[in-house]
Amino acid sequence: MDFFCYSYMVVILPTYLAKAAGMAASAAGLLAAAAFPAIGILGSMAGGILMSATGKRKPILAAGQALKLAGVLVLTLFLEQSLPAGIAGIIIFAVGNGMWMPVMYTMPMEMDGMDDNRVGAAFAFMSSCGFLMGFISPILGGGLTNIMMGMDPGQTTVLCHVFGLKWSLFLFGFTNIAALLCALRIEETGK
């Protein structure tokens, strides 16, 4: 599920920032490009440090998913009123997006009955599902944006596009609820 919302956000974020917040296209692109690698690194480091310090996996995985949901909500609900609030939403999402990775790459190695071959297959399966969702999400998101644009009649084309991007991203954010529920149900593999 992670790649589903993340891939859609990465695709639309520069346009959404430029149109909803009135940013220059180059500044919006730079912010979007820098946010996920730079802040995502901090989230990954935090996830790894917390995992090492606590020996737990599940709470960190769940916290990452909750942060991603919170980040999407803050971004979509506040960007048009406040660019700093929108940027805060991006940062919250990016931290959560990075936080889950150390956990998900550790858990398969700790599960009962796993050996080198099975761990490799688990990583391949997780990556394949992620890339598939990353391919599908912009296609579905574009269609959803077009549908949402039609729900905001009487506005300029730009405002309709902002409306469509905002609410399609808002809805995509709820995939993080499914990921959070899965994180809460998964068996703790840490000590």
Predicted regions and their residues:
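Short extramembrane helix-to-coil loop segments that connect adjacent transmembrane helices in Major
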Residues: 17-27, 115, 151-152, 161
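Multi-pass alpha-helical transporter architecture, strongest
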Residues: 76, 165-191
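A late C-terminal transmembrane helix in Major Facilitator Superfamily
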Residues: 113-151
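Helix-to-loop junctions at the C-terminal end of transmembrane segments
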Residues: 43-56, 145
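Transmembrane alpha-helical cores of Major Facilitator Superfamily
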Residues: 33-34, 38, 66, 124-132
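Extracytoplasmic gate region of multi-pass secondary transporters
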Residues: 1-47, 101, 137-138
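C-terminal transmembrane helical hairpin of 12-TM major facilitator-type secondary transporters
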Residues: 57-107
